[in-house]
């Protein structure tokens, strides 16, 4: 409680030293995790406004040094290529709109790095807001899971959460990943009596994502917790202790809930053993066909959802059939399909620059800087996005 009071007091003092414009946006930034609980649209508006506010702040203060960052320049190159491809697509107005809107994501990242999150106490306060949001979302998901289990203990359903779709675990597994990482790193760095609660909190986040049935989000969060456990301080004995607790916890979870375990083991084995005859491959395939048919400029940003039904079967050597979704459920296939070979290469360069910039921050030897490379490295790891 003393730490909480001290953090709030320090943040309050920090806000008083800022202009009303900057202080207002910092408070608005803190509200993000709670807005995310409402629905994704309010969260998307929040993210977009942060980006617009950052541009306005840079203009008012004449602070444009952030444009010199290598990852920002590679992002600009990729965006320029995407805009050109969108402009010459079969539906330029729609595709240009999608391409212009895409820039909100790197703008938000830049705003956090160079403006809103440039203060340690603000980062700690944001993590506290994330913790509140995680507890609330976990309550939603556990309640839904308990209700489903009470109605049919053997049902192999995925949770919908407050969003009504099948990927609510992405909120905890991806958006709240930094919280789990920091909790795990601090737990490893302290004697087990002092760090146990933080370690259990990180483990509970993993457990909640697992019961949603979302395998990729579960794997990503598990990997992030493990990497954070060895990226800050190396304590082999504590890693073994917490690893043993995690193993026991997962074993108990899968034995108590065999339907959850079946989705992660039996169903996964069936799908991966015959991948090229699975719905996952069928959703990726039309993106590959479109990329092969439009190798230079691609079909335009966001055009997969518009053109998928018209994408031909493609070459006979490309096994399987086409199955249309809003996107091909594979990030790198989508890059090649929508922006062509130049966008694909520029996108890879952008991703590499982001990871390298985050990794170089390890030289500062602070908790946050030592862990910063983990989220982009995992998020951009080649993976299906439909599971």
Locate each region found by the language model.
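Long extracytoplasmic/lumenal interhelical loops at the membrane interface
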Residues: 271-285, 297-339
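Transmembrane signal-anchor hairpin modules in multi-pass inner-membrane enzymes, especially those
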Residues: 1-97, 114, 118-124, 128, ...
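Alpha-helical transmembrane segments of multi-pass inner-membrane proteins
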Residues: 29-33, 107, 121-155, 163-234, ...
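Loop-to-helix entry and N-terminal half of a specific, functionally important transmembrane alpha helix
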Residues: 24-32, 326, 356-387
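Non-cytosolic membrane-interface motifs at loop->transmembrane helix junctions
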Residues: 94-101, 156-161
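Active-site-proximal inter-transmembrane loops
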Residues: 149-167, 316-329
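Membrane-embedded alpha-helical segments of multi-pass membrane proteins
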Residues: 41-58, 99-110, 169-179, 219-226
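A membrane-periplasm/extracellular boundary helix in multi-pass inner-membrane enzymes
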Residues: 211-212, 229-276, 285-293, 301
